[in-house]
Amino acid sequence: YVSFELDTFWAMRGGMDPLAVMDRLGDRLKLIHQKDFSKTSDSPINLWTVNDPNVLVTWDSFGKGSDHKDFCEIGTGIMDIQSIINKGNELGAEYIVLEQDHTQLTQMESVRISMDSFHKFSGLDW
């Protein structure tokens, strides 16, 4: 069968509940990409509210409704990361990769905040 890697941030931005997507993938989910969505973002969470789902997404239209300020350090935004970790463990996902497309901070400060936050979650092996 086919294994999957899920970016929970982009699943959410695509109007999906990341936990429901994870349930649907079941034990085929092997890797999780985890970002966080800023509490102060003015952008819509669901990008289909500003993009027509019946029109092919192109490189030029991909970013419509998205902004660099939508991204924030892990654990400082609105995503329910502990529930995502719990679901990943329940399904046997092997890895969670922390990822951040953009930051308002220096790269090193961003990494430090995300790692400090991620260490506070349970159900992870370091």
Feature-to-residue mapping (PLM):
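Short, well-ordered coil/turn segments that N-cap beta-strands
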Residues: 1-3, 28-30, 90-95, 124
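A short, acidic, amphipathic alpha-helical segment used as a generic capping/interface helix at domain edges
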Residues: 76-89
